[in-house]
Amino acid sequence: MHIASDPRRPIMVILATVSAFAISMAAAAQHRLITQGNDRLAIVDAGGDIEWEMPWRGIHDIHVLPDGHIMVQRGASEVVEIDPETKQVVWSYDSRLQNGNAGKAVEVHAFQPLPPKSAVNPTDDWRLMIAESGTARIIEVDRSGAMLATTPMTVDKPHPHMDTRLVRKIAKDRYLVCHEGDGAVREYVQGTGQVIWDYDVPMKVGEGPDEARDGHGPEAFGNKCFGAIRLPDGDTLIATGNGHSVIKVDPAKKIVWSVTRNELPNIRLAWVTTLELLPNGNYVIGNCHAGPGQPLLVELEPKAKKVVWTFDQFDRFGNSVPNSQILDTPGAIR
């Protein structure tokens, strides 16, 4: 028996394929997150809608506390805690004014809450770590503003705006510091400031010019590293800033993994800023100054370098979104 062919069949197959792809993408993890851009600080739900927001100027670091309060920078040197229900600042510390810094040029680009009795703070006291650029020191303060610890940093090209970018305490007596101006990542011993590991970020990883270029977007080029995290296997993941790449470096300083500017399909990495290691092993990469049509965040399965999620809200947050925090993945390393 002859069965007549259906002229609609090719179209139906295409539609089925597209639908399957759409369902697959919809099934992929969507994330609730907090970020800042276009003078707005906002929590975005997993569906991409604004859940909460308030006016706020630019930041370089952000942390949401267990009680939901938000810690961000205000201006160049102050760290504040915001109650999201009232949208009021309930605590602050200004590095330009406190603990011996009055009259000095100081900027703060990184800070980190240190919960009591944790791997990074074995004491009974809640602490806040603050990296002070200009005075080149890392301090830990309590709620009263009293300084409980201080650690000097080594800076080859001192400048209050470029001494540091993100800094993280990675053990009870260790700090991992991104030095933007020096183009280096250094690990310090708390108190003494001894450098026990360091890595000079290469000017070129993969494609790119052979010398630095000014700017902030895809046209810029250099080794102004922004973020670094220590991975559980002992390697260090580094966001190279205007190097347009992420590199994984082993303790012997060998690059063992990387993703470069145009390596991901339809994605252009610009000023690469933040890094998060999710519990499933995926990396979330901050992609700042990339321009319209490019994601602000990229979640990547590193082994296959497969993009599993992107956050693209350029129209809402603009071209300068330096930091964010994924809020629905407890246990992430950032």
Please annotate each region the language model reported.
Residues M1-M12:
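N-terminal secretory signal peptides that target proteins for export/translocation
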